[in-house]
């Protein structure tokens, strides 16, 4: 009986020992990778053309990281598909920390716009650190007979479906900003999509359409010349760059909040030690006075975070924008 018992147990013990050894080797291999990282060039993918906020943030980070880590760090612009093409390239890259993504709120909006999406935003990308935040500014033609948001809502309710707001295109952040205003303020302002912010702003300034939401730098430039009037910002608190402009939440739309964030991602499954190192390097890079000045010039504010904090922000926005997109029946399929 004892002999038979040994025959049954022995293979099981051997199998268990083998599994434990394999697990140990895998852990050792991963830890070793993290210890020698980085040992070669790091690539930061930007899913938009050069010159925009994500691109400039990536270049600031690349410059500072290169000096700190002693390895080359380059920016790789891969525009197209509203940011999906570049993000997908990082989602499908090796999980070694050498291919990163400087992403934005567009990453949380895009999955809700398509019935089939090339990657899983929760599993295939690892949030490393938020970098900066901003918001949109509600602009109206200066000839519109309103002095604040309360007046605008009153006017829109008296003319349901007759007024128009412009956007940079279907599914853009200013499109969703406007859709949220329609919902929360109980108004019906029609959407006119353009191919970019500039032509939409031109038509607001010319009085062809009544209003739109625009990024802070664009809003400031047009308002300074008197071409548009700024009524409110979409962020939960007033912006340091525009302290005199109230938030929508304090302007008769109490539940309104739409913040734009920018942040660094690694491929899903990247070792946590590498992710933590990258988060520390990101914080170090944007703690430099010169980098902070560049953020201000871009019309954004520093918003550095831990990987866990950034993951929560991204997941919350994935859920929120899915609800908004569903409520307005928007699809880009």
PLM feature spans:
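A ligand-binding cleft/hinge motif common to bilobed small-molecule-binding domains
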Residues: 107-116, 182-184, 211-245
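N-terminal (or domain-start) structured segment
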Residues: 33-123, 162-164, 170, 186-213, ...
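Hinge/capping helix and adjacent helix->loop/strand transition within the periplasmic-binding protein
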Residues: 92-97, 112-199, 248-250, 261-294
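Beta->alpha turn/N-cap motifs
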Residues: 102-107, 167, 197, 214-219, ...
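N-terminal signal peptide c-region/cleavage motif recognized by signal peptidases
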Residues: 29-31
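Bacterial N-terminal signal peptides that target proteins for export
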Residues: 2-20
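An extracytoplasmic/periplasmic, membrane-proximal ligand-sensing/linker region
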Residues: 39-41, 224, 272-333
